[in-house]
Amino acid sequence: MNLLGHLGIVNSVGIALRETVLRSNKDPLANENLELMDADRGSIVTADDGVPLAVREVGPTDAPITAVFVHGYCLRMSSWHFQRQALEKEWGSSVRMVFYDQRGHGKSGEPTPESCTIEQLGSDLDAVIRAVAPRGHLVLIGHSMGGMTILSLTRQRPDLVKERVIGVALLSTTAAGLAETGLGKSLNNPVIDAFRLAVRASPGVVQLGRGTVRALISPVLRAASYGTRVSPRLVAFSQSMIDDTSVVTIVNFLKTLELHNEKDALSHLTRIPVTVMCGDEDWIIPLASTLAMAEALPEAEVVRVPQAGHLVQLEFPDKVNAALVRLLTRASAVRARRRSGWRGIG
């Protein structure tokens, strides 16, 4: 059964579970400020094609390491809430954390249809690094489309990786397209295909199909978000990110998600610490796709999270945070060796 076939079951079970938690009145996140990073230092970085990218950062500007977090499809930077919250305490002044909204997401600007590509997202990440972290060592952390973004940057800028990147985390992502599996297979629908053509050919009539397309796409993304019972507040939070993403943006990125191929980038990551993490209940990017990518990274730490859905960093934040702490420890060792003139994997 494909993802669309699961929707009725998942939605019914999900509603029942959420109602059970609500009746118990013990939602652990009832009073959680899930938009914590709205109070962090903010700036706007202009992408190479003029699209404004919203950036937030926390930690000393002169920290020896900058960790750049890149969010996924139909999300925004606050999807890293639990990492921003916990890792600031864990890493202290040794790491500056940088977060940004990808083009067409969150508070960043709307892109043209032609620029909704993994290639362009890699260029956007490069622009963010040039603007806010032009010097020093980097750890790059990406979830879903954010992981693809990091691989795109790696292919485009192997010099940057060689000289400055000392660690990479790839969460719930893949190096190859999703046309035949996961999201691509689940959204193989003539209505969505027609809307995609309309966006390019007749932007003025796009409004007519927005509701229909959202009704097809949103349930797919919602059902795949979590593999276990989670806080109703968390469900509402992730759903708000999906709902706040323009349908035009959602559809315009589908083709690049289906067809991208960044396998060539993996060879540039074999000599630095890498963490690959995935949930075995992820229907957006199936476990097999993530593990296939990991095979090209024999020294990577592979963390398989039982029962986790696609939003592993929200569903199992403690496991993700622990993996990132381990990555930073390995990356710090690489930094020390590079500073002493020796190069090699940590």
Predicted regions and their residues:
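Short beta-strand/loop motif that positions the catalytic acidic residue
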Residues: 269-270, 276-278, 282
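Conserved HGGG/HGGXW glycine-rich cap/lid loop of the alpha/beta-hydrolase fold
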Residues: 51, 56-110, 131
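An N-terminal hydrophobic leader/cap segment in hydrolases
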Residues: 2-44
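Conserved alpha/beta-hydrolase catalytic His-Asp/Glu region
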Residues: 203-268
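Flexible "cap/lid" loop of the alpha/beta hydrolase fold
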Residues: 155, 159-204
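Catalytic active-site module of serine/aspartate enzymes centered on a nucleophile-bearing elbow/loop
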Residues: 298-346
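Active-site glycine-rich loops that stabilize anionic/oxyanionic intermediates
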Residues: 72-76, 143-145, 174
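Active-site loop/oxyanion-hole signature of alpha/beta-hydrolase fold enzymes
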Residues: 95-148, 155, 159-161, 322
